[in-house]
Amino acid sequence: MKVAVLGAGRVGGAMALDLARDSGFQVTVVDLTPEALKPLEGVPNLSLMEADLSDQEAVRRVMADQDLGVGAVPGFMGFRTLQAILEAGRPAVDIAFFPEDPFLLDGLAKAQGLVAIVDAGIAPGCSNLILGRLEELMSETTRFECVVGGLPVVR
């Protein structure tokens, strides 16, 4: 399966490395800046591509020969990037946590028979799965609090 990871920051880069460890995936990491891609040079099963992911047409071109798009761009770019992945006719998993309502893209995805999984990060994302599991196991959940820090600081 050909997977494009859109965004090579700390989270996107880590996801790309994890995916590249599985020989079932051919991973392409895409970012605007060579500096973001440089730490991923020479990783087996991983190719690098420079592209402006704020340009929806560029995203559609990137996705033309991919099977799955993984959105790992900053939140302010997330909605439009996800939209472009779907417009390219590809399913998507997104961790951007953008402010727009993802259900605005529901019709676009359904019209093409595509799946789009949004908010698939730590929180939201894993926290939602944990809460869902607790709901299954417990008779009643009255409160769930999840406290999550931001991205780690490189020192």
Stretch-by-stretch model annotation:
Residues G132-R155:
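Conserved anion/nucleotide-ligand pocket segment
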Residues L68-A84, F98-P102:
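Beta-loop-alpha module in the N-terminal Rossmann-like domain of NAD(P)-dependent dehydrogenases
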Residues V43-D55:
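Rossmann-fold cofactor-recognition segment
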Residues G12-G13:
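N-terminal Rossmann-fold NAD(P) dinucleotide-binding loop
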Residues T33-A36, P99:
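Helix N-cap at the beta1-alpha1 junction of Rossmann-like dinucleotide-binding domains, i.e.
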Residues V3-G7:
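Conserved N-terminal Rossmann-fold NAD(P)-binding element of oxidoreductases
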Residues I95-V118:
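Rossmann-fold NAD(P)-binding glycine/threonine-rich loop
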Residues L53-D65:
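Conserved Rossmann-fold cofactor-binding substructure of NAD(P)-dependent oxidoreductases
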